[in-house]
Amino acid sequence: MRLLHVIGIGAGDPDQVTVAAVKAMNEVDVFVLIDKGSAKQELVDVRTRILDEHMRRPHRVVEFVDPPRDRTPRDYDAAVDTWHDARARALGDLLDAEPDDAVGGMLVWGDPSLYDSTLRVVDRVRARLDDPFEVRVTPGVTSPSALAAAHGTVLNRVGEPVLTTTGRRLREDGVPDGVDAVVVMLDSDCGFLALPDWHVHWGANLGTPDAVVLAGRVSDVGEEIVRVRADLRRRAGWVMDTYLVRRPLGR
């Protein structure tokens, strides 16, 4: 393989795919999708719908099975490193089977730069090659952008910083001094519940027919979000959620 396009496709709506992304997609001979199991088949189906909508040239789609990951590790960083290494081996084996002049493509939810491991895994694949393929990255609409649009709001007040972090860090470290707005993605434990006086804008599976959004004071809507999130996981088989929590004015 001579070239791999890593293409951000937004939150799942084919209409969110940028013109630049469509142009990059139409240079691709073979798209690589990660099979995450039957419970998350819709994640593959969304990518397939995007290809059906935007591709104008012959192409193939190949899949590799996502290696298992320890979800309750003693050492979180080490567990993720092991998982990324297994992903890199699986992806490398698949790309090795393609012709030397082939152009590959990987469709990344949201934007490849934010809360996604694709580029890290691709770097590991390239590091093992004597003559590594070229990588070109096309940005996409991020889930925080899609969240803000769905709620018709902005992420920050005037002159206000925004912290983007994980649910785990929010639970363990709390909110740093001087931070009044926090964006979190993929938080199954709903860490915002620890901030009952703050205001939350929450959304899940944005850009898909199952999209849900809720907003309000955490003490008023927090438990409803927990229930809605659990119900969505039962119905759809997966949840990708994002939320913005903001400190009340004057606090």
Task: List each model region and its residues.
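Short secondary-structure transition/capping segments
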Residues: 81-87, 107-117, 149-156, 182-195
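Class I SAM-dependent methyltransferase SAM-binding "motif I" and its flanking Rossmann-like core
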Residues: 109-179, 234-236, 251
